[in-house]
Amino acid sequence: MRVVLQRVKEASVTVEGTVAGQIDQGFLLLVGVTHDDTLEQVNWLADKIAGLRVFEDEEERMNRSLQDVEGKILSVSQFTLYGDVKKGRRPAFTEAAKPDVANELYEAFNARLRQQGIIVETGQFGAMMDVALVNDGPVTLILEK
């Protein structure tokens, strides 16, 4: 599982002209699932993200977690995170999980975050989406398990 995390001041995802999810301060997560991912990896990443201290404290040090600042998450599935561009000019997506497997693990990932008291908004799995954000920092991390 691969997650691109962006600390945001606000973010939204629109599907067919309708806002599917939006947040103020928090994380925009782009979530990719590969074919050999497990529930153990999903839970590890969700727990890691919930506890990451990447928000500034009074001394402007990254010392506060999403829960400390009462932030939210906008989680967007993105199979293209497993695009392989080693050969040719068009990405191959053979490392991305099949949609039924990916959706199940993506939903489990979001559920694990919610179990920790975090509000999680989402896009629509498998849909073409427009994602808008105001990056804060910018702070962008790539997490993989």
From Swiss-Prot:
Q: Which reaction does it catalyse?
A: glycyl-tRNA(Ala) + H2O = tRNA(Ala) + glycine + H(+); a D-aminoacyl-tRNA + H2O = a tRNA + a D-alpha-amino acid + H(+)
Q: Per its UniProt record, what InterPro entries does this chain match?
A: Daa-tRNA_deacyls_DTD (IPR003732), DTD-like_sf (IPR023509)
Q: Name one Pfam family in it.
A: Tyr_Deacylase
Keyword annotations from UniProtKB, A to Z:
Cytoplasm, Hydrolase, RNA-binding, tRNA-binding
Motif Gly-cisPro motif, important for rejection of L-amino acids per UniProt: ranges: 137-138
Question: Which GO cellular component terms are attached?
Answer: cytoplasm
Q: Where in the cell is it found?
A: Cytoplasm
Determine the domain of life of the protein's source.
Bacteria
The Gene Ontology biological process terms listed for this entry are:
D-amino acid catabolic process
Query: What EC number(s) are associated with this protein in UniProt?
Result: 3.1.1.96
Major place of residence: cytoplasm
Q: Which molecular-function annotations from GO does this UniProt entry contain?
A: D-tyrosyl-tRNA(Tyr) deacylase activity; Gly-tRNA(Ala) deacylase activity; Ser(Gly)-tRNA(Ala) hydrolase activity; tRNA binding
In the record's own words, the domains note is: A Gly-cisPro motif from one monomer fits into the active site of the other monomer to allow specific chiral rejection of L-amino acids.
Concerning NCBIfam families, the annotation shows: D-aminoacyl-tRNA deacylase (TIGR00256)
Q: Which family does it belong to?
A: Belongs to the DTD family.
* Function of the protein: An aminoacyl-tRNA editing enzyme that deacylates mischarged D-aminoacyl-tRNAs. Also deacylates mischarged glycyl-tRNA(Ala), protecting cells against glycine mischarging by AlaRS. Acts via tRNA-based rather than protein-based catalysis; rejects L-amino acids rather than detecting D-amino acids in the active site. By recycling D-aminoacyl-tRNA to D-amino acids and free tRNA molecules, this enzyme counteracts the toxicity associated with the formation of D-aminoacyl-tRNA entities in vivo and helps enforce protein L-homochirality.
Q: How does it assemble?
A: Homodimer.
- Supply the name of the protein: D-aminoacyl-tRNA deacylase
Organism annotation: Exiguobacterium sibiricum (strain DSM 17290 / CCUG 55495 / CIP 109462 / JCM 13490 / 255-15)
